[in-house]
Amino acid sequence: MSYVRNDSLMYQMPVHFGPCVTPRQNKEGKRFIYDQATRLTKHTIVYESDPEALSAVLPQRFELAAPYVIINMNMLRDVAWLAGHGYNLTGVSVPTRFHGEKGVVEGNLLLVMWENHADPIITGREQLGYSKIFASIDDIHTYGGVSKTELTSWGFRFLELEFDANRQPENLEELKRVLNNPDSQGIMHYKYIPRTGGGFTQADAEYVCLNPKAAKLPDDVKKYPADQLTYMGGQVRWHIPTWEDMPTQYHVAQALGSLRSEERRV
């Protein structure tokens, strides 16, 4: 007797073995109750870039709100939906405005997010529309007040990030304005899933998603201590790959690495 999928529960391929576990559903098929805080160490670096070059990587109906590239490097540990395991991620976004059918939405558009484990990549791509792909991401290591990490693909180092507590940002007030934009409504994503067959050139799904900043949390969500925040100097080093270096991602790193930066801040 064949199975019947339960439309009230979440599934991901392969669906043959029952509902899946995601950040939004536990093994009993209910919402996860995060009774233990996820430990998050987050480093962010912001730098100016050429407005025309940034606009060239935006989808239709998006416009550039400010000529900045924002790179987040997060280390997540004690993640409840991963049974206490953790992973690293690095996301690249730009401040934008999306002109939708019902109005204009302002927020950062996530261009790409690298993660070092398949589980968060799959759930984020399929359920939330994140443009997630895989890379090896070193843990942040710190010595003498300088924190560093690097990203590699097939052994090719394509991105280095450095955060220096020994020096201040070049323009602290502007940095705060970019990172704490009061007009931002959240993080936007451009979801695209190709249709099977027909040359694989058409979309099964293609639309803009929003993670709203003002989303109301359930009443049973615990409150945890406020984040500890430090501003410091930083530096970005992109290494431009060939196709042989990063066979399926070379065009991503080439495009981002070609965005010239005149000013670097974190």
State the predicted function of each range.
Residues 2-26, 124-265:
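Interaction-surface and assembly-scaffold signal
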Residues 23-73:
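N-terminal ordered "arm"
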Residues 28-33, 55-61, 81, 96, ...:
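Intrinsically disordered, low-complexity boundary segments flanking structured domains
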Residues 41, 88-90, 143-147:
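Residues at beta-strand starts and edge strands
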Residues 48, 74, 95-97, 114, ...:
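Structured loops at beta-to-helix junctions and adjacent beta-edge loops in soluble globular domains
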Residues 65-99:
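Short, structured protein-protein interaction patches enriched in aromatics and acidic/basic residues
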Residues 81, 101-105, 174:
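Low-complexity, polar-biased intrinsically disordered regions enriched in Pro/Ser/Thr/Gly
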Residues 93-128:
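Hydrophobic alpha-helical segments and helix pairs
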